Amino acid sequence: MVSYQQLIGLYSPAPQSGKSTVAGILERDYGFRRVPFAAALKKMTETFLTSLGVSPERIAHYSEAGKLEPIPEAKGATYRKIAQTMGTDWGRAVIDRDIWLAPVINDYEINGGLVVVEDVRFENEYNAILDAGGEMWKIVRPGRSEERRVGKE
């Protein structure tokens, strides 16, 4: 039996452009697995918030719809601020700029299959997907201004 393999990275010059929607369609209609670069970071953030006494239900809220809401137990920091500083200021700046790439690329190289990465935000992430034999799809939503670009977040 021949196993087909494909790696697709999604990026957009503007937030809320439909990357998750496209990833959902690829997952639902074509059997892709969604493997985000931020998966390990999200687990770290959830563990940190749990240690502060934030309930799993509230963590789920803060990690999705409530990303910009102050979290009292975290001295008023938002989920987004916590995740961005852990991911960029600590992970990328202190440990290694490629810290979040290995789990995704290793998963793809070991398990293969159809994989979509919907959270490509930096140039090294973009290049890692291409270097692994994948392709990059630019998602553009009419009416959204180009507030950020790959490598600028």
Predicted stretch roles:
Residues 10-11, 117:
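Hydrophobic anchor at the beta1->P-loop junction of P-loop NTPases
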Residues 15-16:
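Walker A (P-loop) phosphate-binding loop of P-loop NTPases
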Residues 19-20:
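Walker A/P-loop
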Residues 27-35, 53:
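Post-Walker A helix-loop "phosphate-sensing" segment adjacent to the P-loop in P-loop NTPases
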Residues 33, 102-146:
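ATP-dependent NMP and nucleoside kinases share a basic, alpha-helical "lid"
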Residues 39-113:
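ATP-dependent small-molecule kinase phosphotransfer cores
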Residues 147-153:
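Conserved small/polar residues in nucleotide/adenosyl-binding loops
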